Each structure stands twice: as C-alpha cells, then as structure tokens.
Amino acid sequence: MASREKTSIEGHMFDVVVIGGGISGLSAAKLLAEHEVDVLVLEARDRVGGRTYTVRNEHVDYVDVGGAYVGPTQNRILRLSKELGLETYKVNVNERLVQYVKGKTYPFRGAFPPVWNPIAYLDYNNLWRTMDNMGKEIPADAPWEAPHAEEWDKMTMKDLIDKICWTKTARRFASLFVNINVTSEPHEVSALWFLWYVKQCGGTTRIFSVTNGGQERKFVGGSGQVSERIMERLGDRVKLKRPVTYVDQSDDNIIIETLNHELYECKYVISAIPPTLTAKIHFRPELPSERNQLIQRLPMGAIIKCMMYYKEAFWKKKDYCGCMIIEDEEAPISITLDDTKPDGSLPAIMGFILARKADRLAKLHKEIRKRKICELYAKVLGSQEALQPVHYEEKNWCEEQYSGGCYTAYFPPGIMTHYGRVIRQPFGRIYFAGTETATHWSGYMEGAVEAGERTAREVLNALGRVAEKDLKTQEPESKDVPAMEITHTFWERNLPSVTGLLKLIGFTTSVTALWIVAYKFRLLRRS
C-alpha cells in the first residue's frame, strides 16, 4: 500500500471519485460539485454518456443509438435537462399505429392494439389488470418485502403468463411485452422483479405508451447532450479512457488504480456502473458475500437498436405514424417508432431487435440485417418504398464491454428475495449508483438521475454537508411535461377473466339444472 500512496497522481486527495461517466455518475458528480466537494469522474470509454450515446454524422445529423426516451412522471431527468438548456419534442403518433400478426397488418390508435375476439379480450384485460394489481402489493423501495415476494420470486414471467392467460394470443403478446420492456425473455426473469419493474414505471399502460407514457418524448439534439453538458461544467474533473481495476479502502484513504496504472486517492467512492461490471474491479477488502453473489447473478438485457433512413416518410401516405408492433418469430424487429427529426427532416424508423432475436441476428453481417429489416417494413407497411433506404445506423449493445447490454440488468428467479436488499447498501466508504439501484423508472434515464443524486446526498451526509433528514427528497412534477392520470373504464375494472366467466357459466348452468330438476320433481308429485 505504501508504494501505491507514494505514486498517487500529484499527491492530490479528492473528496470523492465517481466510477462511471454515464448520466448516473455525472449527475452525482454535478450535485457534489455544486456543494463545493472536490470530485473526480473516471470513465472507461473515450466518451461520456454510458448507455446513452448520440452519434453525429452527415447522414443523420444526430441520432440516439442508446437510451433516448423521456415522458411524464420522469421529473428528475426533465428538471436536469432543462437546467442544462435542452428541449424535448414529442415522438410522432398523430397517425395510426399498426399491429402485425399472422402475416396481416391491423391499424389502430391508442396504447395497445384492440382485440376483437371476446374471449381473447377478457384474457388481455385480465392480464393487464392482474399485473397492475399484483404490482400494487410490491413496495417500490423494497420489493423483497412484498407479501407474496417469496412465491412470486420463485416464478418466471413465463410461469405467471401461463398461469394468467388462457389464449395463445394473450400469451404471445404478454411475452412480447416482456421482450420490449426489459430486452429479455419471460423464462429468464423473475415474476417478482418484472412486476416491480412495471409498477415503479407507473404500471402497464404508462410503461408501454407513447402519449402520456415512457416513450412520449426525445431530446432535440440527442440524449447524449445530458452527459456532455455536465462534463463541460465539470471540466478537467472528468477523465476519459480510465477503466478502474482496483479499489483499496483498507487504509484511512481510498486508493484507486486504473487500467493504465494511474493512481488516485480519495475519501469516498461512488460506483455508477452496471452491477455486473463491478466484478471487473478488484476490491480490498473484498466485497461482502451478499454483494459478491448479487453482482454475479444480474445479467444485462440484449438489444440491437436500428435506425433506417428514407428520402421521405412514405408511411404517412397510408396514415401510419411509423409505430409498428410486430408479433412474428421470423421478423427481426419487434417494435418500431418514428425517428424523424422534429422539423420533419431526415425521415427515419427506429426499430429494436430484442432478447433472443438480438443474439440470433448479431451473428449475421450488418448488410443482411439491414436487408431483412427493409423487407419486414415493406411487408408490414405494404410499401415497396421501404426497400429503398438512404442510410442505416445500428448499435449492438451486447458487444459493449463497458455496458454488457441494454437497457438494464434483470433479476432471474430467486435473486431479488435472496440478494436484492443489498443493491443500494454502501460497502464501507463505497456507495452504489446506476439506474439499476433506482426506485422510480429504474432502467431509464430518470432512474439514473435518481440514483446518482441519492448517492451524492449520502456522501454529502457522510461529509457532514447534508442532514440525514434531507437524504430523501420529493421531486416536484415537471410543469413542461405534466402527467395525465391513467384511468380505466368500468368494464376494464369489472369484466371477468376467462376463468371467472367459465365459473359464472358453470354456476348459472348448475343453478338452471337444479331449477329444472326441482320443477320436474314438483310436477311429478302433483301427478
């Protein structure tokens, strides 16, 4: 240890070193700097932003190949971005959305595709209602304390879907719902974790919707600007190309070593990287057993984000907005949104290759993926113009060694109740941020800001700069992006499930049969 201390950078002692220059780490550093804390950010990549990444070139002007969407109730990221001088614009859903299933295209309006089969409708309605009701039982800040936590954590979402749904159509869409929201498969994720994830995003409608939902808006100029503008404010307190390999808190001060053997000394550390990536760091003393087990059990989701550019927005000729929900195992893309610039320039469709499909299609050449996507769009939109793109951008997040995947880490069965409670617990003088540790919109930019600012306040409290009563803060609603209450009709609240309908039919049939028997018996007695 003595030799490490002697070679520390310029002998400078920082109050706090933040590991990770994504939105979570930088929002933590920003808040610390505002309290005149001597803070340094170490980022492994040659850029800031983490799982947000705005690419700029002559073909696209700018494009978000990572996290991009914000919406109502995401008040922290909206407040932070406004402070940084950023503006949002609404994702276009003025025209009709389309659902593609069994080789046919069905235009619709609203958050979810309509269901015309009455039995399937009951099944769909019961699915969303049941998931939301189960979510109400789960504390956002302590899902492992839910009344049925142990039972639900032993189940996969596939188990739960099979238990709730009677029809193939409902099971198929429920599986797609999991793919789209957490970029993983229903058989991979804990039912408890997924129900918690949906709940802390505001429920099934809020998380899936564009209008009044998680995908309502994007940032003019790209989401990467959030991190870039914080970096501009912090100046030389952000260092790029510094992967951290060693953290030693065995002495009075913490010593941090990077891959290129630079040493930094500080009083506190904030880790703002995905939980699984902390396994790349050597800790002294070693991590507690529960945290060590946790970080080995949280895989990242799998996604390839694809943007197809066209000469014109040809889909609008058919009164389509560009949003497609695609239920087809052979289709590369599962969901799309219009990615045209807010001024109408550079028409584009953004599509997600998700979960099992991301793994399968990653093995193909980029040009083959591009061709398959164009052929799919031509089929779904019924237009040969889809075969004539002018440019294509994509980002395979599975190959990013300093992310490991996107959007977020997921909990397999059994992990949340056994190890989940340590995800936000400090280890000595090391505090843990990152969107995975958030309790509201975890997995989104909003969760990243919440987690970063929480850990900053925890460190400020340890430094004696913030009182313990101020550790938890209530974020006021954004005045620029107000949330509308999500309501449900009388029928949505009260229609029976398929099981309930069958029981009702069985009961009424039994009552009718008994009445007939009793009536005939009375006639016999009279005769």
Swiss-Prot record:
Tell me where in this chain the PTM S-8alpha-FAD cysteine is found: 406
Q: Where is this region: Interaction with membrane phospholipid headgroups?
A: 520-522
Q: Name one Pfam family in it.
A: Amino_oxidase
* Site features described as Important for substrate specificity, chain residue numbers: 335
Keyword field: Acetylation, Catecholamine metabolism, FAD, Flavoprotein, Membrane, Mitochondrion, Mitochondrion outer membrane, Neurotransmitter degradation, Oxidoreductase, Phosphoprotein, Transmembrane, Transmembrane helix
Where in the cell does this protein reside?
Mitochondrion outer membrane
Q: Which residues cross the membrane?
A: 498-518
Please name the GO terms of the biological process aspect recorded for this protein, alphabetically: catecholamine metabolic process
CC annotations in GO: mitochondrial outer membrane; mitochondrion
Entries under SUPFAM superfamilies matching the protein: FAD-linked reductases, C-terminal domain, FAD/NAD(P)-binding domain
| Site feature Important for catalytic activity, where | 374
The record's annotation in InterPro entries points to:
Amino_oxidase (IPR002937), FAD/NAD-bd_sf (IPR036188), Flavin_amine_oxidase (IPR001613), Flavin_MAO (IPR050703)
Q: What is its EC number?
A: 1.4.3.21, 1.4.3.4
Which molecular-function annotation in GO is an example for this chain?
primary methylamine oxidase activity
Q: How does it sit in the membrane?
A: Single-pass type IV membrane protein
Q: Which residues lie on this side of the membrane: Mitochondrial intermembrane?
A: 519-527
Q: Does the keyword Transferase apply?
A: no
Q: Which residues carry this modification: N-acetylmethionine?
A: 1
Instruction: Give the family, as the similarity comment puts it.
Output: Belongs to the flavin monoamine oxidase family.
Describe the task this protein carries out: Catalyzes the oxidative deamination of primary and some secondary amine such as neurotransmitters, with concomitant reduction of oxygen to hydrogen peroxide and has important functions in the metabolism of neuroactive and vasoactive amines in the central nervous system and peripheral tissues. Preferentially oxidizes serotonin. Also catalyzes the oxidative deamination of kynuramine to 3-(2-aminophenyl)-3-oxopropanal that can spontaneously condense to 4-hydroxyquinoline.
Know the name of this protein? Amine oxidase [flavin-containing] A
The protein's organism comes out as Canis lupus familiaris (Dog)
